[in-house]
Design a protein with these regions (language model features):
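Intrinsic-disorder/low-complexity linker and hinge segments
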Residues: 1, 179-181
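N-terminal, Lys/Arg- and Ser/Thr-rich interaction peptides
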Residues: 1-26
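Alpha-helix initiation/capping motif
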Residues: 7-9, 32, 136
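Short histidine-centered catalytic/ligand-binding loop motif
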Residues: 17-29, 84-91
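N-terminal helical submodule of small eukaryotic multi-pass membrane proteins
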Residues: 29-35
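Positively charged, aromatic-enriched nucleic acid-contacting surfaces
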Residues: 35-179
Length: 181
């Protein structure tokens, strides 16, 4: 079973941390659980996938099952992959369930390319930092992937006040490829 790569519109960006002395920010790429649901729906249709939650040793797990038999016409072979989640700071139980689901989907290959993302640093002149905090809205402008690996990425800061869209671009990265591959 092969799932497509994420599009730039499906990837969200958040500030992971502000660098000491407000010198810049470190950004993190992530996806919402709805993205996983949409990709499952479009790839195997809602009829041929399901999820189930269970608890083991006080830890919440989610398992995602896909009816791989539907691909061959037998309709009786379900394959399940699972993982646990961690609580979020906002809604602990909902966040834990969502995280477990996203991790189980990762085990199917959905969004796996996010784990190959480069270190994303944005200097202070490309963002608004005040008292050690940054609330700017960052967006993936473009992403290029090859074999579930990110090889090109650009991010824009929608909070920068400028008339020129190119001036909003705050991070550009292209993977250097050696002669050996």
């Amino acid at each position: 079973m092969k799932f497509r790569d994420l599009t730039s519109e499906e990837i969200e960006v958040r500030v992971q941390s502000v660098v000491k002395n407000d010198k810049g920010v470190i950004l993190l790429l992530y996806k919402d659980a709805r993205v996983d649901q949409n990709i499952l729906d479009e790839t195997v249709t809602p009829k041929y996938w399901q999820k189930d939650y269970y608890e083991a040793n006080g830890i919440l797990f989610c398992k995602v099952g896909i009816n791989v038999g539907a691909l061959t016409g037998t309709y009786d072979t379900w394959v399940w992959k699972s993982d646990c989640g961690s609580e979020s700071n906002i809604e602990a139980q909902k966040g834990e369930a969502s995280d477990a689901f996203k991790r189980a989907c990762f085990n199917w290959g959905i969004g796996r390319e996010l784990y190959t993302a480069p270190f994303v640093y944005v200097p202070a002149d490309k963002c608004n930092i005040s008292n050690g905090k940054c609330f700017d809205k960052f967006v993936v402008e473009r992403i290029k992937t090859v074999n579930k690996h990110i090889v090109g990425l650009s991010i824009v800061n929608m909070s920068l006040k400028t008339d020129n869209p190119k001036d909003k671009r705050c991070f550009v990265w292209k993977k250097e490829v050696s002669d050996n591959g």
